[in-house]
Amino acid sequence: MNLTQRPPRSPRVRLGGYVLLPRLLDKCRAEIAGTLGEYHYNCPMDRRFFDFAGVDHEALKTQVAQGLGDGSVLAWILENRTHQHSEWEIAQWSAHRETAVPADNESRSFINEKVAEAGGADREDIGTWFDFLDLDDHVTFGGKA
């Protein structure tokens, strides 16, 4: 996984019902390979998954370093997570994360500034954190805001 050449998967992509998980796995693989670029593994957004699932980011990284595919990593997570959630709870958490908006003026101002810098000052559809991440990934790799 080379995140200097293309972005990680969208935070909206799900694995085992979890949003964020495929994206953080892409970042983990890139960190292991030394090709993380501007991305960060175990960033605050990733930690929301780790906290909810009850998974240690270093333990997960050890599993990923063994070359496991997404399905095998998910199986390891399900066996080793400290917070046992039902499918419904995972779906609700994922839906909440997917629709989460900046909760304070500082965060909202940060997103508005970054969207404007990307040439999207008139974009009224960038409301959630996931909207912002998708736009940022797109623009970073040559797309138009």
Regions found by a protein language model. Give the residues of each.
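Residue-identity detector for glutamine
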Residues: Q5, Q63-Q66, Q84, Q92
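A diffuse structural propensity rather than consistent per-protein peaks
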Residues: D56, G69-D70, S86, D125-T128
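Polar/charged low-complexity regulatory segments
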Residues: N2-H40, E89, W93-A145
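Amphipathic alpha-helical packing elements
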Residues: T35-L78
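Short alpha-helix boundary/capping elements
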Residues: A53-H57, H85, V101, G119
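Mature extracellular/secreted ectodomains of secretory-pathway proteins
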Residues: D70-E79, H83-W93
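A short structural micro-motif
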Residues: G67-G71, H83-Q84, T99, E117
